[in-house]
Amino acid sequence: MSLANLRNDLPPVPEADDNRHALRDVPHCREAVALMFQVPEEQIAGFVYFWVTKDGMAGTAAVMIGDGLSSPINERFDEVPVPAGMDFHDWQVNGLTATLGKPHQTLDFTFTGERVQVTGHYEAMHPPYAFSSHKDGCPPYYADDRTEQHGIVTGELVIDGRRIALNHFMQRDHSWGPRVWGLNQHYKWFHATTAEACVHFFEMHSFGKVLVRGYVAKDGVMSEITAIDYDFEFDETMHHKTFDVIVTDAAGRKTDVRCKVYAKTQFDADPMIYLKEGATTLTIDGTGGTGWCEFCWNRLYFDFAKDYAALYA
């Protein structure tokens, strides 16, 4: 898939939105970037995550999971103050560096922890999708806006001294504004990537409504999602282990995605919710690739429901 040969049916995202934003002084306001990647041949997956609050406190984390590890890795650096003028063209915070290149096209980054070190160069496969491009905009309790994009990461991953060359799919998420985790009773954050197609959707359950944002990029056209029809299976812990979906977009196409989770973990982001993470191997219309599927659950509901999942789910 080539940026140059892709027709985008969605409005262009301003170049400035690839950089750090001036955050509003409202509760829970923050900016965050998540870089998800999968190395299935090594039975490893992970993500690098960095953020900054409205008060200028910035933190970083890296998570590595999968049967290819002796044990899971969750390395997180404490938040530290950063200058208001420091932006993502030269971001340096506690073990992480990030350097934007061409807006919405390239990003160089490093993460240096005790067990894991990553040196990566990200190149986008398609233009970013902004939630603000949807007719109803971005849910305001989850960001002023957010962009989602798929690409290729090259570089090196080092785990416990073991060196692994990177030339793999990466999913990049960037959001800014309020993040009130607990207002989603449940959500599904889904990414699927092959050399020929990219699919993303975010289905959110909040205030009695179900909201969906997302896109399909394939066959030279990027188009917004209009409907999703999915099915999935749980394991014995009520963690998703398969996920199959038929996605319909505004161009009238149906895209068939079939996923198996090969690495999983729980990421604790907020006291009200659990984030159940799953790195996947998959097919999009029969072509192989990888992706990520995150389920968010209200903790009270999940703790009650998990004992009934085998019987009723």
Name what the model sees in each region.
Residues 1-313:
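Structured soluble/peripheral alpha/beta segments that form catalytic or ligand/cofactor-binding pockets
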